[in-house]
Swiss-Prot record:
Listed InterPro entries: DnaJ_domain, HscB, HscB_C_sf, HscB_oligo_C, J_dom_sf
One example GO MF annotation: protein-folding chaperone binding
Annotated source species: Salmonella heidelberg (strain SL476)
Domain J: 2-74
Keywords assigned by UniProt, alphabetized: Chaperone
Subunit structure: Interacts with HscA and stimulates its ATPase activity. Interacts with IscU.
Domain of life: Bacteria
Function field: Co-chaperone involved in the maturation of iron-sulfur cluster-containing proteins. Seems to help targeting proteins to be folded toward HscA.
UniProt keyword Chaperone present: yes
Protein name, as recorded: Co-chaperone protein HscB
Family note: Belongs to the HscB family.
Any single Gene Ontology cellular-component annotation: iron-sulfur cluster transfer complex
Length: 171
């Protein structure tokens, strides 16, 4: 059973996140291992396994990027284990330039510049995410897979910038 079916949701990118949360809570109550404490060993094991599956499904579907990766996996794109990389030279050069800029910001310890950088990267991420939504809505799986790969780069860059922000705030 796929994660969307587990939560009673249609297998598409845009989902009702409130319904996801409510169904998660229901499933957690229904399959919590403590409810099976007096059951057989097989029942206890099944409850633990089901609870783990529910938690994994929840973590996957609640985050936009992992939800997209999972949806693509249902259509034959195993992005989680692939060695495939982005072939868009212009995008890769842009990423290299952004990484160098982040390194410069770290050296200068310029809080204002870092804040501006984080906002710019977030805008880039949001724009790509909107492209991804349209691609998934139109079942453009190949293009969507490439966009997810690019979003991973931006997500890592955003994470690095936020870690630098925390580091600079600790000084």
């Amino acid at each position: 059973m796929d994660y969307f079916t587990l939560f009673g949701l249609p297998a598409r990118y845009q989902i009702d996140t409130q319904a996801l949360s409510l169904r998660f809570q229901d499933l957690q109550r229904q399959y919590h291992p403590d409810k099976f404490a007096n059951g057989t060993q097989a029942q206890q094991l099944a409850a633990v396994q089901q609870s783990a599956t529910i938690n994994q499904a929840w973590q996957t579907l609640r985050h936009p990027l992992t939800r997209a990766e999972y949806l693509l996996s249902l259509h034959g794109f195993d992005l989680a284990s692939e060695q495939h990389t982005v072939r868009d030279t212009a995008f890769l050069m842009e990423q290299l330039t952004l990484r160098e800029e982040l390194d410069d910001i770290e050296q200068s310890k310029d809080d204002a510049r870092l804040e501006s950088f984080i906002k710019r990267v977030q805008k880039m991420f949001d724009a790509r995410l909107q492209q991804l939504v349209e691609q998934l809505d139109n079942a453009a799986w190949d293009t969507a897979a490439d966009t997810v790969r690019k979003l991973r780069f931006l997500d890592k860059l955003r994470s690095s910038a936020e870690q630098l922000e925390e580091k600079l705030l600790d000084f």
